[in-house]
Amino acid sequence: MFAEYGVLNYWTYLVGAIFIVLVPGPNTIFVLKNSVGRGMKGGYLAASGVFIGDAVLMFLAYAGVATLIKTTPVLFNIVRYLGAFYLLYLGAKILYATLKSKGSEVAHDEVPFGAIFKRALILSLTNPKAILFYVSFFVQFIDVNAPHAGLSFFILATTLEVVSFFYLSFLIISGAFVTQYIRTKKKLAKVGNSLIGLIFVGFAARLATLQS
């Protein structure tokens, strides 16, 4: 399928894309958190930020920026530390809001809906490893002798975005149902918020120690 457009082993790529999307990361956790805390609207706003951020990174990967980042340690480190700092900021903000809440009240990070989109977009764009991954993964399924490599890249990128959309939609819908349950489970909600905050701090530490 799509072999005439320079795509190699499309079905193998699709299976790989599914497994890649299923691996939990900061973007996934952020979408899930907002779907639980702010409902389906909050979840899809977060997902939209992730989709657009990923699309930008894929385009930059195709445009050759990934090679520049990989061969310029200073640039890589700047993006890496910005991403780590932002993850740490989000994690600390969640933990602070949770600890500040009184008794068994649930702490909600009641930011405007527009801010949810911006946070997700920044979270997606400040991950230098993502852009390097797109190049290393996509190149395995593109025929370098094909006349239109850009079209091949577009097909692979679109496929990954579609898979991501369905998976995040599943999380968002599930999160919306969970919201109804935790409204009567205040302590459970506080534990969940604390866990999410710690996960973001962990992602920050991991990103800060990654090498190009």
Curated annotation (Swiss-Prot):
One Pfam family, short name: LysE
**UniProt cross-references to InterPro entries, sorted A to Z:** LeuE-type
* Gene Ontology biological-process entries: L-leucine transport
Function of the protein: Exporter of leucine.
Q: GO cellular-component terms in the record?
A: plasma membrane
Specify the species. Answer: Citrobacter koseri (strain ATCC BAA-895 / CDC 4225-83 / SGSC4696)
What is the membrane topology here?
Answer: Multi-pass membrane protein
**GO terms, molecular function:** antiporter activity; L-leucine transmembrane transporter activity
Family, similarity comment: Belongs to the Rht family.
Q: Which NCBIfam families match?
A: PRK10958.1
* Record field: catalytic activity: L-leucine(in) + H(+)(out) = L-leucine(out) + H(+)(in)
The compartments listed are:
Cell inner membrane
- Protein name per its UniProtKB record: Leucine efflux protein
